Amino acid sequence: MQKFTVHKGLVAPMDRENVDTDAIIPKQFLKSIKRTGFGQNLFDEWRYLDAGFPGQDPQSRKPNPDFVLNQPRYAGASILLARKNFGCGSSREHAPWALDQYGFRAIIAPSYADIFFNNSFKNGLLPIVLPEAQVAQLFDETFAFPGYTLTIDLERQVVVKPDGGEFAFDVQAFRKYCLINGLDDIGLTLRHKDKIKAFEAERLAQKPWLAHTMIS
């Protein structure tokens, strides 16, 4: 998992409340047994005018020119600004996968659905919670100033605006540790591989029959 310490990026405003996971990555794209390739179908039903299906060549699609991510001023955005209850709806880890694979490193919103919020941290995506008034101010400034960027300093837990103003945010210490060190669940487990090997060796010494393969 990619480490997250300080990130400066272009902001894209998703000016809708209650954006659900089916909007983030529609259900027809969940059939893949792979964990990659979801970025091209992020917000598929809003992003394109034609119906999308798995395996489709994105170059053959008809982009919706009115959708925020298709507007030239937001090309290359890596910070998504959203309204309240982002990521609601059914549980699907594909939602943070799609956002991450599109190129987003962080989301800023007043609130999130719990499962989406937890899944984001586990996949290297930082979901920042700010008060609605601060989020509204960021929306106003993003709309007013083309090329609007923010700097997110996870170590200091602040969002830094272009004028130097800062908005502080909270993040659980363990989640912060994992993001700064680029550790997902597998990475955390591998940090204890020596202890795991020692435990397995001791267990097999005490119960050698566990190593035998039963043949039926």
Swiss-Prot record:
Transmembrane segments: none annotated. It is an enzyme of class 4 (lyase). Its EC number is 4.2.1.33. One of its GO terms (biological process) is L-leucine biosynthetic process. Belongs to the LeuD family. LeuD type 1 subfamily. Heterodimer of LeuC and LeuD. HAMAP family: LeuD_type1 (MF_01031). This is 3-isopropylmalate dehydratase small subunit. It comes from Variovorax paradoxus (strain S110). The lineage of its organism: Bacteria, Pseudomonadati, Pseudomonadota, Betaproteobacteria, Burkholderiales. The gene is leuD.
